[in-house]
Design a protein with these regions (language model features):
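Non-catalytic, surface beta->alpha helical segment in thiol-disulfide oxidoreductase systems
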Residues: 71-89
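Short, thiol/selenol-centered motifs that function as redox-active sites or metal-ligating centers
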Residues: 28-35
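Alpha/beta-hydrolase fold active-site loops
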Residues: 19-20, 73
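Thiol-based oxidoreductase modules, predominantly thioredoxin-like and allied folds used
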Residues: 2-5, 24, 36-43, 47-62
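ABC family nucleotide-binding domain
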Residues: 30, 43, 66-69
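A short beta-strand-turn-helix
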Residues: 2-19
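Short loop/turn elements that flank and shape the SAM/SAH-binding pocket of Class I
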Residues: 10-12, 60-63
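Short pre-active-site segment immediately N-terminal to redox-active cysteine/selenocysteine motifs
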Residues: 25-28, 71
């Protein structure tokens, strides 16, 4: 699983080909921490089919807002630079 930051998000997600799952999480977010092991398990199982990434929104608030991530945790699927689906838990 690739850990993103505000400097790598564009190249690794918005400019990357194919499908990419991004786990938007935050420091101190209990539901985020509970979800993280499941996302890592999916990455191990399906990592050859989809790129798995995570972004700590505590360190990239403006980026999260630009992606319309207003609550946490958010799991988003990107394809060819566009968010095509998302889920807020």
């Amino acid at each position: 699983m690739l850990e993103l930051d505000k400097n790598t998000f564009e190249a690794e997600v918005l400019q990357a080909p194919g499908k990419i799952l991004v786990d938007f999480y935050g420091d101190g977010c209990v539901p985020c921490a509970a979800l993280m092991p499941h996302i890592h398990a999916f990455a191990e199982t399906y990592g050859d089919k989809i790129k798995f990434c995570a972004l700590n929104t505590t360190k990239a608030r403006r980026l999260a807002i630009s992606q319309k991530v207003l609550g946490l945790p958010v799991i988003a699927i990107y394809e060819n630079g566009e968010m095509i689906d998302s889920c807020v838990k």
